[in-house]
Amino acid sequence: MDYTLTRIDPNGENDRYPLQKQEIVTDPLEQEVNKSVYMGKLEHALHDMVNWGRKNSIWPYNFGLSCCYVEMVTSFTAVHDVARFGAEVLRASPRQADLMVVAGTCFTKMAPVIQRLYDQMLEPKWVISMGACANSGGMYDIYSVVQGVDKFIPVDVYIPGCPPRPEAYMQALMLLQESIGKERRPLSWVVGDQGVYRANMQSERERKRGERIAVTNLRTPDEI
């Protein structure tokens, strides 16, 4: 079988992810509250209850590509105990999972497989890109490695590092839970575009920039 690498054209017509239609809008529930106090508050409570159940029962797909996967499964040990976040139920089938963690190097031959597995996951579903290789290709600036999995699937949380520690993976789960808690999805089955409203989350780099600039006493590499 012949494999070819097709470059992404950001100006081309493409209605598939990650080049899907996105726009910044206000929270639709705020408009409903102003229209009807009772129904608006009821819908707000229903969304909060559903999102609470979703964010505390994330089932990750047992899927690893490289050494970052070793750090991911380390978080399932008793030392880290990722079960505290409700994400310890590993699924061997994408149809039973709602979180895909792309942990490792994504080669061009593997990209169609990841794409197909992502398509087999049911909504709601989320993606975590774990490690420098999955985020941007890492040190493999070569034709055979995809320079970031967000070239063909949408990514919700990026974990930097080569490889990241298990604590970084658990922090990503907490950030994903925070994002899920602010989502607005249809409360019933929807065929086609669901029209999901996601909160505009601030990146950790921007959030911690002021704190890092204020640091004056830097520890030596010999200190922990």
From Swiss-Prot:
Q: In the Enzyme Commission scheme, what number(s) does this protein have? A: 7.1.1.-
Q: Which reaction does it catalyse?
A: a quinone + NADH + 5 H(+)(in) = a quinol + NAD(+) + 4 H(+)(out)
Q: How many cofactors are bound and how? A: Binds 1 [4Fe-4S] cluster.
Entries under InterPro entries matching the protein: NADH_UbQ_OxRdtase-like_20kDa, NADH_UQ_OxRdtase_20Kd_su
Main role? NDH-1 shuttles electrons from NADH, via FMN and iron-sulfur (Fe-S) centers, to quinones in the respiratory chain. The immediate electron acceptor for the enzyme in this species is believed to be ubiquinone. Couples the redox reaction to proton translocation (for every two electrons transferred, four hydrogen ions are translocated across the cytoplasmic membrane), and thus conserves the redox energy in a proton gradient.
Q: Species name for this entry?
A: Klebsiella pneumoniae subsp. pneumoniae (strain ATCC 700721 / MGH 78578)
Domain of life, per the record?
Answer: Bacteria
Q: Name one GO molecular function term.
A: NADH:ubiquinone reductase (non-electrogenic) activity
Q: Which UniProt keywords apply?
A: 4Fe-4S, Cell inner membrane, Cell membrane, Iron, Iron-sulfur, Membrane, Metal-binding, NAD, Quinone, Translocase, Transport, Ubiquinone
**Cofactors that this protein relies on:** [4Fe-4S] cluster
What lineage does the source organism belong to?
Bacteria, Pseudomonadati, Pseudomonadota, Gammaproteobacteria, Enterobacterales
Topology with respect to the bilayer: Peripheral membrane protein
Q: What is this protein called?
A: NADH-quinone oxidoreductase subunit B
